[in-house]
């Protein structure tokens, strides 16, 4: 049986490919990108947090608590994961980036089932790994902090070092598509209007 799990939306990046605009706040069909993630993610978790390092007031308007990085300096998604592990009120935390509006509706249940005895698991589709879609036990918080303090930043290397389980999401590559550029957003909006 799946326990209570805290979900954390990772919105703490610099959004350099979006011209510095906060990616999670980019409007898509009149709604901020991160709100699509909330809509898909919230039903899967018992509690939800947003990790953001700027524009926190705008994220708070969603009614979801906002947490910032404890280890500062825009050190990547691992800093947001560390913050999530630190602030979570549950033993397990699942992460998703703010720029994937169609994330799988079975993300959490599949990661939970696929983790087996591991303390962490991450998504993998038919083509590649998606390490920002990860489930972690809060006991990894200290190990993750040590990794970041050493100056390491590579998410996959950290997941490999803790023997995270790779969980296959066959036939779902399109659900992991992230919107990195304004052109990606335009294309996504066009597809949605065409449905």
UniProtKB/Swiss-Prot annotation:
<comment type="function">
    <text>Transfers a GMP moiety from GTP to Mo-molybdopterin (Mo-MPT) cofactor (Moco or molybdenum cofactor) to form Mo-molybdopterin guanine dinucleotide (Mo-MGD) cofactor.</text>
</comment>
<dbReference type="InterPro" id="IPR013482">
    <property type="entry name" value="Molybde_CF_guanTrfase"/>
</dbReference>
<feature type="binding site">
    <location>
        <position position="23"/>
    </location>
    <ligand>
        <name>GTP</name>
    </ligand>
</feature>
<keyword id="KW-0501">Molybdenum cofactor biosynthesis</keyword>
<dbReference type="GO" id="GO:0061603">
    <property type="term" value="F:molybdenum cofactor guanylyltransferase activity"/>
</dbReference>
<feature type="binding site">
    <location>
        <position position="51"/>
    </location>
    <ligand>
        <name>GTP</name>
    </ligand>
</feature>
<feature type="binding site">
    <location>
        <position position="99"/>
    </location>
    <ligand>
        <name>Mg(2+)</name>
    </ligand>
</feature>
<keyword id="KW-0547">Nucleotide-binding</keyword>
<keyword id="KW-0342">GTP-binding</keyword>
<feature type="binding site">
    <location>
        <position position="69"/>
    </location>
    <ligand>
        <name>GTP</name>
    </ligand>
</feature>
<feature type="binding site">
    <location>
        <begin position="10"/>
        <end position="12"/>
    </location>
    <ligand>
        <name>GTP</name>
    </ligand>
</feature>
<keyword id="KW-0479">Metal-binding</keyword>
<keyword id="KW-0963">Cytoplasm</keyword>
<dbReference type="InterPro" id="IPR025877">
    <property type="entry name" value="MobA-like_NTP_Trfase"/>
</dbReference>
<comment type="similarity">
    <text>Belongs to the MobA family.</text>
</comment>
<dbReference type="GO" id="GO:0046872">
    <property type="term" value="F:metal ion binding"/>
</dbReference>
<keyword id="KW-0808">Transferase</keyword>
<dbReference type="Pfam" id="PF12804">
    <property type="entry name" value="NTP_transf_3"/>
</dbReference>
<dbReference type="GO" id="GO:0005525">
    <property type="term" value="F:GTP binding"/>
</dbReference>
<comment type="subunit">
    <text>Monomer.</text>
</comment>
<dbReference type="GO" id="GO:0005737">
    <property type="term" value="C:cytoplasm"/>
</dbReference>
<dbReference type="InterPro" id="IPR029044">
    <property type="entry name" value="Nucleotide-diphossugar_trans"/>
</dbReference>
<protein>
    <recommendedName>
        <fullName>Molybdenum cofactor guanylyltransferase</fullName>
        <ecNumber>2.7.7.77</ecNumber>
    </recommendedName>
</protein>
<feature type="binding site">
    <location>
        <position position="99"/>
    </location>
    <ligand>
        <name>GTP</name>
    </ligand>
</feature>
<dbReference type="GO" id="GO:1902758">
    <property type="term" value="P:bis(molybdopterin guanine dinucleotide)molybdenum biosynthetic process"/>
</dbReference>
<keyword id="KW-0460">Magnesium</keyword>
């Amino acid at each position: 049986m799946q326990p209570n799990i805290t979900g954390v939306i990772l919105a703490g990046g610099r959004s350099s490919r979006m011209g510095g605009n906060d990616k999670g706040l980019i409007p898509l069909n009149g709604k901020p990108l991160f709100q699509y993630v909330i809509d898909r993610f919230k039903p899967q978790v018992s509690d939800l947090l947003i990790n953001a390092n700027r524009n926190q007031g705008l994220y708070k308007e969603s009614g979801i608590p906002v947490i910032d990085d404890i280890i500062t300096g825009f050190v990547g998604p691992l800093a947001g994961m560390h913050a999530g592990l630190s602030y979570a009120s549950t033993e397990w935390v699942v992460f998703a980036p703010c720029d994937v509006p169609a994330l799988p509706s079975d993300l959490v249940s599949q990661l939970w089932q696929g983790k087996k005895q591991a303390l962490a698991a991450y998504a993998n589709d038919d083509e590649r790994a998606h390490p920002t879609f990860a489930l972690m036990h809060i006991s990894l918080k200290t190990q993750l902090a040590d990794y970041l303090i050493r100056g390491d930043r590579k998410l996959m290397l950290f997941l490999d070092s803790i023997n995270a389980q790779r969980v296959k999401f066959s036939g779902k590559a399109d659900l992991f598509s992230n919107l990195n550029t304004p052109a990606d957003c335009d294309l996504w909006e066009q597809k949605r209007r065409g449905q």
